[in-house]
């Protein structure tokens, strides 16, 4: 048997360090067993998926040195490798489940589903809806079908008992069927959900080992049941521990930068980032901290993965990156790294239009453009003394903008402008006044190049990191304030 593993990211935003972490372990496991590593794109979310995000994923993984044997850009015998191009395949297998009685069409409206869940909640039952809960009288089903109501295809699941799933790291995992819902397999637009698409794709692509984050453990019974319905052999499962913040909370872009693009923009070396990700819950047999990707692949043993919840510590990564710079880069290599980092034509050409109208001598460039070549600006609370806002309003403005930017999938100036305008109107402020503290937070100065252009060039994670830094410099948001801010933010009609 040839070992075949895969990574299947969704192109809905910046490439996440968690994606790179799971990809690294899949790659090392495959190479350790002389196998193949596949990259598949889960782009069934038609609203949020973008070609730009897909390209960023490919570029980021390659930057880290993670190469795949088959994928949307390199091809292979099991394509297409984008789920959006495999719709007919999923429809065929969904129909097979319907014909065999393992799935059913559900015409329930969202309002009816809410009522059913509320009824189960009031009765003290699991909120998972079963086929019996969703059933309609035959004549009502016939009427909705005749009137062409929208429907989804759901899988049938047992109402009682438990499902036992084997895991490479955790042994046998038992999940009560009572907490497993009649999962949607095909959405009303005909696109598959994760559950159907992944089972079908993993089988057709010959995936032998599914190594993914532990957040998918509760979905494993659905996948096992689908393999049984199709009468297919199930791949070996391995649920990896999730990356954690230093406070042990789940790694989240709300607390820390999570984009590979951020670390690349900050000037981290790809070999240092890959090395550090390799230390997430795993160690070399001799426990050394610094090792190459080739050394990790040669010594990889999945049983050495610890389930304790690896901590992604930025200070530790920064230390390791410094070791690489000092020990591995001579002057020529360091100069080349600087060019690749920021002093390259592609990046500088984005900045030149911002500074050209404002300079008289070449030495004027760095004071105007220094924020494009640095991490977070060296701010103090006094940096905001010229902002004529109450302290809490200032914190709220920066926090609301940070949250607003988390939802931006197309990071371009026109989109950012619309979002900032919407928030400025919600605060009943003119754009100039609203942007004044944002200028300082993002560029480190009250006067600089266009802050919206700067945000577009710096990227989403770097921009949000600078906004979070400004909030911290101003004393931070207390837990009490955070709760109030979140409530107010949800109530905003923007």
From Swiss-Prot:
Pfam families for this protein: Anticodon_2 (PF19269), tRNA-synt_1c (PF00749)
UniProt GO cellular component terms: cytosol
PROSITE patterns: AA_TRNA_LIGASE_I (PS00178)
Catalyzed reactions per annotation: tRNA(Glu) + L-glutamate + ATP = L-glutamyl-tRNA(Glu) + AMP + diphosphate
Residues involved in ATP binding: 253
GO BP term, example: glutamyl-tRNA aminoacylation
EC code: 6.1.1.17
UniProt short sequence motif 'KMSKS' region, positions renumbered to this chain: 250-254
NCBIfam families the record matches: gltX_bact (TIGR00464)
Functional summary from the UniProt entry: Catalyzes the attachment of glutamate to tRNA(Glu) in a two-step reaction: glutamate is first activated by ATP to form Glu-AMP and then transferred to the acceptor end of tRNA(Glu).
Subunit comment: Monomer.
This protein's name: Glutamate--tRNA ligase
Species assigned in the record: Chromohalobacter salexigens (strain ATCC BAA-138 / DSM 3043 / CIP 106854 / NCIMB 13768 / 1H11)
Higher taxonomy: Bacteria, Pseudomonadati, Pseudomonadota, Gammaproteobacteria, Oceanospirillales
């Amino acid at each position: 048997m040839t070992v075949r593993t895969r990574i299947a990211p969704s192109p809905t935003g910046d490439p996440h360090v968690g994606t790179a972490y799971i990809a690294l372990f899949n790659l090392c496991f495959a190479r350790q067993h002389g196998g193949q590593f596949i990259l598949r794109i889960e782009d069934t979310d038609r609203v949020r998926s973008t070609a730009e995000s897909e390209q960023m994923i490919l570029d980021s993984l390659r930057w880290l040195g993670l190469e795949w044997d088959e994928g949307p850009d390199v091809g292979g015998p099991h394509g297409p490798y984008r789920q959006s191009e495999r719709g007919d395949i999923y429809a065929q297998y969904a129909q097979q489940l319907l014909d065999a009685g393992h799935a059913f069409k559900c015409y329930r409206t969202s309002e009816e589903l809410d009522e059913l869940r509320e009824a189960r909640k009031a009765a003290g039952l699991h909120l998972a809806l079963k086929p019996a809960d969703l059933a309609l009288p035959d004549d009502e089903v016939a009427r909705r079908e005749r009137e062409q109501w929208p429907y989804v295809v759901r899988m049938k699941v047992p109402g009682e008992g438990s499902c036992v799933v084997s895991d490479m790291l955790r042994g046998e995992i038992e999940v009560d069927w009572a907490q497993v819902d009649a999962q949607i397999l095909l959405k009303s637009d005909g696109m598959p959900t994760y559950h159907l698409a992944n089972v079908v794709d993993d089988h057709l692509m010959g995936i032998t080992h599914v190594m993914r984050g532990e957040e998918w453990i509760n979905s494993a019974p659905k996948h096992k049941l689908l393999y049984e319905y199709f009468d297919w052999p199930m791949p070996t499962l391995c649920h990896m521990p999730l990356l954690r913040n230093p406070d042990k909370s789940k790694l989240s872009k709300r607390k820390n930068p999570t984009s590979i693009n951020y670390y690349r923009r900050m000037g981290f070396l790809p070999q240092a980032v890959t090395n550090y990700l390799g230390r997430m819950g795993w160690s070399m047999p001799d426990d050394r901290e610094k090792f190459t990707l080739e050394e990790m692949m040669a010594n990889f043993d999945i049983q050495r993965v610890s389930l304790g919840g690896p901590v992604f510590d930025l200070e530790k990564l920064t230390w390791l990156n410094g070791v690489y710079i000092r020990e591995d880069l001579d002057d020529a290599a360091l100069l080349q790294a600087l060019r690749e980092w920021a002093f390259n034509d592609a990046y500088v050409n984005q900045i030149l239009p911002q500074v050209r109208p404002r300079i008289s001598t070449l030495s004027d460039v760095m004071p105007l453009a220094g924020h494009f070549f640095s991490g977070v600006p060296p701010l103090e609370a006094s940096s905001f003394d010229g902002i004529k806002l109450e302290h809490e309003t200032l914190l709220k403005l920066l926090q609301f903008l940070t949250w607003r930017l988390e939802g931006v999938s197309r990071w371009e100036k026109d989109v950012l402008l619309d979002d900032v305008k919407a928030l400025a109107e919600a605060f009943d402020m003119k754009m100039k006044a609203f942007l004044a503290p944002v200028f300082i937070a993002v560029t480190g100065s009250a006067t600089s190049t266009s802050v919206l252009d700067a945000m577009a060039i710096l990227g989403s994670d770097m921009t949000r990191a600078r906004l979070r830094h400004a909030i911290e410099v101003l004393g931070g948001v207390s837990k009490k304030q955070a709760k109030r801010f979140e409530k107010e933010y949800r109530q905003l009609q923007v």
